[in-house]
């Protein structure tokens, strides 16, 4: 059997970092990363980006050496991705924060609203309902992270956790401060507005969960397989007929419902910022589907049926 020689160079300086002799032709990039780690333990596999060109795209872990456009002596270029952290850890951290931060304002712990309001309770029903909805949303997210989601990438850059937590925790504190404030004013149209908003919130939360379950069933555990998602017997998944990322559609709908329920400006701004970011993600996933699958349904839009 013909073996390969693999030299790994620094993508910036072109310095030779490692030379691997007698590498099996069937070796994957993941296996080469493991071999590289033996000579450079500080660069564990998740930190490594190996590519054929210094400015090219990173090779996938499942790429096989003999199927790459290289000779028997392959030259790969290395870039350090920096310290990594697991997606699960990031999600648990960024979702647990809003849950507990909101409750601090709801229970009016000392030093927030003034001594005479410490541990007092709001007289408005909508305030208590908002706390239930907000808590339910993030408890759902935490449970989905632990038991539902299957991640195609195991890690992300450590710096992202600070950015993500600033966003989620900051907005949670901002909206909680006003919703639970002793001078908070209930919605203009009273109980009718709250009931309508609650219905929107509940429907969208059920829809979001249904989509996450449908996406989970598409990918076997431990696999990176990608398939076209289609509607199932669950009516909430029928939105797949019109959009590529209905989980984002339902998520935005949930926050719109919460904004209507509380009639609170910070919630409306959080909904707008979230919609903007999710639209960017949805467009990216939509493009990936179109590029990967020739038979991808042409009627679908990224996030809003017929529009966007």
From Swiss-Prot:
PTM annotation (N6-acetyllysine): residues: 22, 60
Membrane topology: Multi-pass membrane protein
EC code(s) of this entry: 1.3.1.93
Residue spans, topological domain Lumenal: 107-124, 181-189, 263-264
Disulfide bonding pattern of the chain: none
The keyword Hydrolase is annotated on this UniProt entry: no
Subcellular location: Endoplasmic reticulum membrane
Residues with Phosphoserine modification: 58
Residue intervals on the Cytoplasmic side: 1-86, 148-158, 217-245, 293-308
GO cellular component: endoplasmic reticulum; endoplasmic reticulum membrane
Segments crossing the lipid bilayer: 87-106, 125-147, 159-180, 190-216, 246-262, 265-292
GO biological process, one term: steroid biosynthetic process
Swiss-Prot/TrEMBL catalytic activity: a very-long-chain 2,3-saturated fatty acyl-CoA + NADP(+) = a very-long-chain (2E)-enoyl-CoA + NADPH + H(+); octadecanoyl-CoA + NADP(+) = (2E)-octadecenoyl-CoA + NADPH + H(+); (2E,7Z,10Z,13Z,16Z)-docosapentaenoyl-CoA + NADPH + H(+) = (7Z,10Z,13Z,16Z)-docosatetraenoyl-CoA + NADP(+); (2E,7Z,10Z,13Z,16Z,19Z)-docosahexaenoyl-CoA + NADPH + H(+) = (7Z,10Z,13Z,16Z,19Z)-docosapentaenoyl-CoA + NADP(+)
SUPFAM superfamilies assigned: Ubiquitin-like
One annotated GO molecular function: very-long-chain enoyl-CoA reductase activity
Self-association state and partner proteins as the record states: Interacts with ELOVL1 and LASS2.
Biological role: Involved in both the production of very long-chain fatty acids for sphingolipid synthesis and the degradation of the sphingosine moiety in sphingolipids through the sphingosine 1-phosphate metabolic pathway. Catalyzes the last of the four reactions of the long-chain fatty acids elongation cycle. This endoplasmic reticulum-bound enzymatic process, allows the addition of 2 carbons to the chain of long- and very long-chain fatty acids/VLCFAs per cycle.
Protein name listed in UniProt: Very-long-chain enoyl-CoA reductase
Provenance organism: Bos taurus (Bovine)
């Amino acid at each position: 059997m013909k073996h390969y020689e693999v030299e790994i160079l620094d993508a910036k300086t072109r310095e030779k970092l490692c030379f691997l002799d007698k590498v099996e032709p069937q070796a994957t990039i993941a296996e080469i990363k493991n071999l590289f780690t033996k000579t450079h333990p500080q660069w564990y596999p998740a930190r490594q980006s190996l590519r054929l060109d210094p400015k090219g795209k990173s090779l996938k872990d499942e790429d096989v050496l003999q199927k790459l456009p290289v000779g028997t002596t392959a030259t790969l270029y290395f870039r350090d991705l920096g310290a990594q952290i697991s997606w699960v850890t990031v999600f648990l951290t960024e979702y647990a924060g809003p849950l507990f931060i909101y409750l601090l304002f709801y229970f009016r712990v000392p030093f927030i609203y003034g001594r005479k309001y410490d541990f007092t309770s709001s007289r408005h029903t909508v305030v208590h309902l908002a706390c239930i909805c907000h808590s339910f949303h993030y408890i759902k997210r935490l449970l989905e992270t632990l038991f539902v989601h299957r991640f195609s990438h195991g890690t992300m850059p450590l710096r992202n956790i600070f950015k993500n937590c600033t966003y989620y925790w900051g907005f949670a504190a901002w909206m909680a401060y006003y919703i639970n404030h002793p001078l908070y004013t209930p919605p203009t149209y009273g109980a009718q507005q709250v009931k309508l908003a609650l219905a929107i919130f509940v429907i969208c939360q059920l829809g979001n969960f249904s989509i996450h379950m449908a996406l989970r069933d598409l990918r076997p555990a431990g696999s990176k397989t990608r398939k076209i998602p289609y509607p199932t017997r669950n009516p909430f998944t029928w939105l797949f007929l019109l959009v590529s990322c209905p989980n984002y559609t339902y998520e935005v709908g949930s926050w719109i419902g919460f904004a209507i329920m509380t009639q609170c400006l910070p919630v409306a701004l959080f909904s707008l910022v979230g919609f903007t970011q999710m639209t960017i993600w949805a467009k990216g996933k939509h493009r990936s589907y179109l590029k990967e699958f020739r038979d991808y349904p042409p009627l679908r839009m990224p996030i809003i049926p017929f529009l966007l």
